């Protein structure tokens, strides 16, 4: 990976002149079945941009109560985008895994075009896998069900897919399964610096028009950088060499959970470890 970074062709990405960054953005967009992509310095920035593209100031974003967008992004969606958030319980039903999306619960909360009486719901954010849920995976059919309901209501979807790579590996589809997940959302963020092992960066994907808007917003937030090809090269290398290795991470996480449970019964449920978080 470091050799790829050192040898990467670079240019000025603010002017769209970095060939390695462009190649990464195009590749991730194609994998997720979207028109265009945008490299960002962090997953939080990718989420802020993705949500802001879908939610105008004063409109509402729905998400679960332990979602990264509402718990770990320092209030950025409200402070920087004027976005109102409303949440459903992360364990949406008794006994349900924390972070597992329940389309019935989400649909009951949506209030699109609410007029002068309630805040209008503009978008729903879902997270797959779910960080604070310990790597909970929402199965693809559930996301597809949610997508049908939100589409019928005229509500957009942002997918925080920081660990989406882990979800598709756990499902057994690998990179080939990404497009089906991408089709469940209007904007998707994926992280290169978690399980994939790149040093920096996330990619936001969406329509070409939305990504052009995001490029402007990224600069406004201080995320426009110059010779980003040295970072993008790491992402490209990770996509070529590290995705399949996530299965090994998952195996080790299960082994760690089993060992912890054996040493101190009740401290962790090994059956709940489906990806790489214990």
Functional labels for PLM-detected ranges:
Residues 1-8, 13-278:
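Conserved PLP-enzyme active-site core in the AAT-like
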């Amino acid at each position: 990976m470091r050799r790829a970074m050192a040898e990467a062709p670079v240019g000025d990405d603010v002017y769209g002149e970095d060939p390695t960054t462009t190649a990464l953005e195009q590749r991730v967009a194609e994998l997720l079945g979207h028109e265009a992509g945008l490299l960002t310095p962090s997953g939080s920035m990718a989420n802020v941009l993705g949500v802001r593209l879908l939610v105008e100031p004063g409109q509402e974003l729905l998400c679960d109560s332990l979602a990264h967008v509402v718990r770990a992004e320092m209030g950025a969606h409200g402070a920087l985008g004027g976005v109102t958030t409303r949440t459903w319980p992360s364990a949406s039903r008794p006994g349900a895994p924390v972070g597992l999306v329940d389309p019935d619960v989400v649909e009951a909360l949506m209030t699109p075009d609410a007029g002068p009486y309630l805040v209008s719901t503009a978008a729903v954010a879902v997270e797959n896998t779910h960080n604070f849920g310990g790597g909970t995976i929402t199965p693809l059919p559930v996301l597809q069900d949610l997508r049908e309901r939100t589409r019928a209501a005229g509500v957009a979807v942002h997918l925080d897919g920081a660990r989406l790579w882990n979800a598709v590996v756990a499902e057994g589809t690998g990179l080939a399964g990404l497009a089906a997940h991408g089709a469940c959302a209007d904007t998707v963020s994926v992280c290169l610096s978690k399980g994939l092992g790149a040093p920096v960066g996330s990619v936001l994907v969406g329509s070409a028009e939305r990504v052009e808007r995001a490029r402007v917003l990224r600069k406004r937030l201080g995320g426009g950088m110059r010779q980003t090809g040295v970072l993008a090269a790491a992402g490209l290398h990770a996509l070529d060499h590290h995705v399949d290795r996530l299965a090994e991470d998952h195996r080790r996480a299960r082994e760690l959970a089993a060992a912890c449970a054996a040493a101190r019964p009740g401290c962790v449920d090994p059956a709940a470890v489906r990806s790489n978080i214990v």
